[in-house]
């Protein structure tokens, strides 16, 4: 249940922040948070990261539904007693669902977190994207420790 609450928290935070951006900012408007480093920039993306597969909504619908079903299956089947695995899956579920809601409702994803590292403008992203990335990193860490435990046995 905890893992689904994590996913729900991510979905609510993601959708609330996207609603604030859409409601209070013009497309392309940028607000500095830390000048030359972090901005809130109103952006839309019809594809994946870096605009890959722009406009291929049916592809994203099918893949995302399959991923969500897979994550729910793994939570139900394997997450009991595996806190790190469950948290990682909850984060990925929330992230996948957050961006799916955008694609289904708007046919695009609202992005707004704009990071500049030296002179490189990292692709603008959102809370769902961040949640997916952190979830994948935690899953990788879980897999490293889990495979180490299996080798010891």
UniProtKB/Swiss-Prot annotation:
Q: Which InterPro entries match?
A: Peptidase_A8 (IPR001872)
Pathway per its UniProt entry is: Protein modification; lipoprotein biosynthesis (signal peptide cleavage)
Pfam annotation, one family: Peptidase_A8
- Key words of the record: Aspartyl protease, Cell membrane, Hydrolase, Membrane, Protease, Transmembrane, Transmembrane helix
Q: Which EC class, in a word? A: hydrolase
Query: What kind of membrane protein is this, topologically?
Result: Multi-pass membrane protein
**Which GO terms of type biological process are on file?**
proteolysis
- Catalytic residues (UniProt): 111, 129
Instruction: Name the EC number(s).
Output: 3.4.23.36
Spans through the membrane: 52-72, 81-101, 124-144
* Keyword Membrane (UniProt): yes
Coarse class of the primary localization is membrane
Q: Which GO terms describe its molecular function?
A: aspartic-type endopeptidase activity
Reaction catalysed? Release of signal peptides from bacterial membrane prolipoproteins. Hydrolyzes -Xaa-Yaa-Zaa-|-(S,diacylglyceryl)Cys-, in which Xaa is hydrophobic (preferably Leu), and Yaa (Ala or Ser) and Zaa (Gly or Ala) have small, neutral side chains
List GO terms (cellular component aspect). plasma membrane
Report the locations given in the UniProt record. Cell membrane
Q: What does this protein do?
A: This protein specifically catalyzes the removal of signal peptides from prolipoproteins.
The UniProt entry's sequence similarity note says: Belongs to the peptidase A8 family.
Q: Kindly provide the name given to this protein in its UniProt entry.
A: Lipoprotein signal peptidase
> Which gene does this sequence derive from?
lspA
